[in-house]
Amino acid sequence: ATIIPATTIKTDAKTAIDKKAEQQVTIINGNNDATDEEKAEARKLVEKAKIEAKSNITNSDTEREVNGAKTNGLEKINNIQPSTQTKTNAKQEINDKAQEQLIQINNTPDATEEEKQEATNRVNAGLAQAIQNINNAHSTQEVNESKTNSIATIKSVQPNVIKKPTAINSLTQEA
């Protein structure tokens, strides 16, 4: 009977896959541009790719096949990133509303340049706060609530039109 030497090629390949999957999950969890739901979806994909790669390694018959399965598995796991659409879309929507509001402010009749600038500053401050709130949000629900509140705040900003009407009023009264 022939004695077949023990080999660690498959075990080592599977260990490399496990380590890569663990690293990728850490990277996914650290992605602040993704919501919890988007991260969970990416982690599921990593787990699926890990199981598939280890199965391919198990089913390989030669060292070359094992190495090919390992390389393909590592590459597949490495390419899995969470979607960042939720936060990206929310920021874009808020930014669009802020730009619309700035146009409206600049077209306010009887507002002085100073009054328009003061309102513009409030919109920009609201926009900056909104982006920060979106960045700090974890769940899709938190992102959506933050977006809704931020848009309402930004849309409520109007110039305090006082100087020109007051001047016109006092001229009218003097006349």
Label each region the model flagged.
Residues A1-A175:
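Amphipathic alpha-helical assembly segments used for oligomerization, scaffolding, or translocation
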